[in-house]
Amino acid sequence: MGTLTDPTVDPADPHVKADDGAGLIDAGQVHPERLETLAEDQSQRDGANGVHFPVKTNTGNAAESTASTENGETGSIDVGKLRTKPSPVQTHIHRGGSEGLYRGASGGIYRSASGSTHIHRGASGGILRGQSGGIHRGRSGAIHLPSLQSISFSMTRLPEEDAGVMMHFTETKETETTPESSRASDEDAPTPKKKHRLRKHLTAIGAYSFAFRFSETVLSLIAIVVMCSTRGSMRTDGVDFGTLKFNHFQAYRYLVAVNVIVFVYSTFQFIQLLYTVILGISFIPSIFISTWMTFGFDQLFLYLLLSASTSAATVANMSYTGEMGIQLCSRFDVGSFCSKADVAVTMSFFAVLAMLSSTILAIYRIAVLLREY
C-alpha cells in the first residue's frame, strides 16, 4: 500500500508520536509495515469499510493530519486534507482502480486512465428539465427534443363577414420522454414533430348567408344576360317597323343597371366570405364595422332592385294588356321579345328575395353585436 509520512514532521525527532487508539508510538521508530498493520487492526475494531488513524505532533500549533483508507465500489483510497481545528469539514477524493478521478455517485467529473475528462450526469446520462418539455442530451452529445402530443379545441365566434364561422384549431403539446435505459443511443430518441393547423367551418347561419350571396350573384347575372339579349322584329300586316330592343324602354334599362350593381356587390360579398372561410382573413378587420356596412349596403341595394323589378314588371304587363287598346306583344308579333323580358323580370324578383334574406341575416348579426357590446 505504501508508506504514509507527514512532510512537516522530522522522522528523526524522538518526540513525534503516532496514536493507534491504544497508546503513543515513536514515529521515528515505526516501520511503514507497522503503520499498515495498525491500520488493519483499527479497521477490524471499528467494523467500518476503512481505516482511520491520526498522526499527532508536539509542535504546539494545534494541527491534525488525518488520513483514511476506504475500500469503495472500485477499491478507492480516500486521502483527507490537512485541516485546522475546530473545522469539521472534510473533503474526500475517490481514486478508482483505473487511476482516475471520480466525484460523487450520481454525478460529477470522471477522469479516465488516458487523461480525458467525462461528464456524468445522472443515471439516464442526460439533462432533464421539467415534465412539460426540455432538452435531453445523450451520451454521444446529440440533443433530443421531447415528443409532441396533439391537442385540439374548437371555438365559435361572430365573423367579420356575413356568415357565422366555426374556427377549429389543432395545435401541439410538448411532453417529456425519458430514455428507457441510460445507454439509449441517439437513434432511439423520438423524432419531434410540430403541426399547427387552422380550419374554419361554416355554421348554419354562415351556410345560409353563403347560399344567399351565391344566389344573388347568379340570378342578377341571368337577369342581365337575358334582358340584354331581348330583341325582336316588329311586323304587322306585312309592314316592318324595325327591330325592337330592350333599351327602347326606360324601365328595362333601369332594371339592367340595377342588376349590374347588385351583381358586383354580391360577387364582392361572396368572394369576401369565401376568402375568410378558406384563409381566415377578412377584408375589414373590425366585426362591428363590417356588420353595419353589410347591413347598410344590403338595405340600399334591396330597395333599388325592388324598385327596378316592379318598374320592369309594369312595362311587361302593359305589353300584354296594351295601352289605349294597343297590345304590343300580340299585334306586332314580338312574342319572343316579351317572353325574354318576362324571364329577366322574374330572375330580378328572385334576386330581390335573396337580397331580402341576406338583409334579415344582417339584422340578426346586429342584434348579436348589440347584446354582446
From Swiss-Prot:
Membrane topology (UniProt): Multi-pass membrane protein
Matches recorded under InterPro entries: CASP/CASPL, CASP_dom
Extracellular side: 226-253, 298-342
Topology feature Cytoplasmic, residues: 1-204, 275-276, 364-373
Glycan-carrying positions: 317
UniProt family annotation: Belongs to the Casparian strip membrane proteins (CASP) family.
Main location, first listed in the record: membrane
Membrane-spanning ranges: 205-225, 254-274, 277-297, 343-363
Listed name of the protein: CASP-like protein UU6
Pfam families reported for this sequence: CASP_dom
Keywords, in A-Z order: Cell membrane, Glycoprotein, Membrane, Transmembrane, Transmembrane helix
Region of interest (Disordered), residue spans: 1-100, 172-195
Keyword Glycoprotein attached: yes
Subunit organization: Homodimer and heterodimers.
Compositionally skewed regions (Polar residues) per UniProt: 56-74
Cellular component GO terms held in the UniProt record: plasma membrane
Subcellular location: Cell membrane
